[in-house]
Amino acid sequence: MAENNYEKYLIRRPMYEVGGKVKGRQAPTMTYMSNDLVPGCNLYIDLSWIYALPEPNPHVFEHSHNYDKIVLHIGADTENFEDLGGEIEYYVGGQPLAFDTTTALYIPKGIKHGPITWKKFTKPHIEMSIMLGAESTEGGWVSGDIGRQKEGLPGKKDDIDYEKYLVRHPAILEGTDVTEAMKSPAKIYMSSDLIPESNVYIDFGWIPGFPDPNPPIPDHVHDYEEVVLLIGGDPNNPEDLGAELEFCVGDQPLTFDTTVACYLPKGIKHGPLTWKKYDRPHLLMPIIIGAGTLAQAAPAGQKVE
């Protein structure tokens, strides 16, 4: 039997395929997960840096998708993680939601959302979209009237308070072997404890220096699919990770120094994750699909004996 080459699951360079002609933000956005990149993953993930007040503003208008979606706005201040560096007004179901903190927004399939308007800008920050179940780029992003401006603002047509889908402040995971080694607690921004309708676990945090001990994450497995993102913190060079790491997947060492996404099918052993070099802070984000609770996600997984 031929051995698996797990390199096929590691996205070292993104596709630049969506968006354009928008000042003040990275456009096109960086696609780090799709069926074009990893056939059969049925996920779509893109991200981009916001450098200034976008122009035009808004440039994303009311639209909907046939898939559940999670939108993250992530502050890049490693000393004040929850400070977004801007103020955004995001319409969901015709209801305006305003925030100036790092947030996660869960949008069930079929719910209209947009426009998205930046009201203030103080520091660069990241916008990330995760589409669950999307089989193609078109299904994951280009949907409805996303780029078409309409007269007036959307009106609310139901009695749902869409605030319930917005995570303004994270649950904090600390006191574990992993968080102690990272010198930084993990911030949980999506789980069924936070959003009961969600069946996805997401935590993330900026890595402030070499973990100690290193590697902080041993080899382990999950009963769920996972995507691990490591995102560089330089908005002027977003593909540069600011570190060199070795990630063992199925006992195959994969070394990288760029922003990456790694898709991990359920049951595939992965780890340890070892830092070889460290230059500046970068973001570590595990996304575990189908694991709604912290207990199900088991951030360190089931250790392999």
What are these regions (language model features)?
Residues 53-57, 92-93, 109-113, 210-214, ...:
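Short acidic (Asp/Glu) patches
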Residues 42, 65-69, 83-85, 100, ...:
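Short connector loops at helix/strand junctions that flank enzyme active sites
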Residues 73-100, 138-141, 232-258, 297:
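A short beta-strand-loop-beta hairpin characteristic of the jelly-roll/cupin
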Residues 96-119, 253-276:
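Conserved metal-binding segment of the jelly-roll/cupin
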Residues 62-63, 87-90, 143-149, 219-220, ...:
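Short intrinsically disordered coil segments
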Residues 46-80, 202-227, 233:
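Conserved short histidine dyad/triad with adjacent acidic residue
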Residues 1-60, 147-214:
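A short, N-terminal "cap"/entry segment at the start of jelly-roll beta-barrel domains
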